[in-house]
Amino acid sequence: MDPGTVFAGYRIEEEAGRGGMGVVYRANQIALDRRVALKLLTPALASDPGFRARFQQESRLAANIDHPNVVDVYEAGEDDGRLYITMRWVEGSDLRQEIESHGRLDPVRAAEIIAQVADALDAAHAMGLVHRDVKPANILLGERRGREHAYLTDFGLTKRVESAGGLTQTGQWVGTLDYIAPEQIRGEKVDARSDVYALGGVLAHALTGHVPFERDSDVAKMWGHINDAPPAPSTVVPGLTPELDAVVLRAMAKDPA
């Protein structure tokens, strides 16, 4: 949509990003004169009754998470046949952009960011909500009280359209392959431990500048998640502490019990 377009009571300011689920715009909520992130989902998702029902349910749950490290969900609805969700606009970047622009993070900074995201996940898991797609792009980095502050986003989009074998009906795996838990690949039931696995992978990426299983194909990545132990971060970046190694290896253990 072009800047100035009004959609569902929101005036579009600019496109902020796009992905497989849809397009994110920076927008202004006209009634409250409030800047928001407006995510407009693809028509294919809007046309699927199963997804629509889950989207509404998950969005309501996400809106009830009251935690400083979770992006506030303001509204989820449908207008002119398009599903949308609006969230707090966070001024800043995201963890993916930070790693792509600057490489691996200072270990203290990486640990602080991941600890904040872990707190956000604890709050969600206490409500029975599993994120299922924890990745650097969903970790927004802003500022709060003069300090860097991490926000976990996309909670309203955590239940994907699944068919046999764990694939979505559009042919995409549930979750991002660089961080996805083995049980998600196998199409098995997921719970909070799947998010912990993914967060361990994100920590490894932040500490080393490399994803846990850098492989030439998606199939090889999936094989790694299912069968191989992730490399300890200190084997990639000498000097990282055994304590950080232990956190990553425990989070990404194949048996999460």
PLM regions with names:
Residues 64, 113-114:
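Hydrophobic/aromatic scaffold residues of ePK-like serine/threonine protein kinase catalytic domains
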Residues 13-19, 24:
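Protein kinase glycine-rich loop
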Residues 28, 115, 121-122, 131, ...:
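C-terminal lobe helix-coil module of Hanks-type protein kinase domains
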Residues 28-35:
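Conserved N-lobe loop of protein kinases adjacent to the ATP-binding glycine-rich P-loop
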Residues 80-94, 98:
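Conserved short submotifs of the Hanks-type protein kinase catalytic core
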Residues 42-64:
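AlphaC helix of the eukaryotic protein kinase fold
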Residues 76:
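Activation-segment/catalytic-loop signature of the eukaryotic protein kinase fold
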Residues 47-50, 142-189, 216:
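Activation segment of protein kinases
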